[in-house]
Amino acid sequence: YQGIIVAEPTNNLAVTCPRVIASGSIRFHGTSGHSSENSALKNSAIHKQARWSFNALETARKYENKKYESLEGLAFNIGSVSGGIKPNIIAQSAETKFGFRPLPGQDPFEIFTELNAKSVKGQFDFTTGFIAPSLPAKNNSHRLKALAGKLKLELSKPVNFWTEAALFNEAGYDAIVFGP
């Protein structure tokens, strides 16, 4: 065996450098009440969620000019937002699920910390979801490029998607991504 090939559509180019992938969820706590009370601005879990979402998008924008070869910025998405019961009840809880794809070499845990920095402790519960390294996971890109060369495969530029090849590489196996 010379290495591992993970099959993904790559236009017949060998991918040796996709992004990191990370996801998380954050549950916001509020104090229920009737919306006729002026406490809704402060107590609504949905309002806390909205402030977090705004700050998270601003955090992602700060990375717009960061580059790794042909990759740019932090790919960030708020994928699911839920909470509340109805318009005249102050929301006691709300939840946001989000994902992001840092550039290779960026630490997803630092970004999690930055995303949650402006949230008030005790008013939310944060849970990390799926987190996986970039490829190459162990700074061994020369070995991955050599594997592609041995197989006479043309190299791809770094790509935005993530694949399981990074997990094989993190476990010590040379792994590339290749497919039609």
Give each language-model segment a name:
Residues 1-11:
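A glycine-rich helix N-cap at a beta->alpha junction
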Residues 9, 16, 22-180:
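Metal-dependent amide/peptide-bond hydrolase catalytic core
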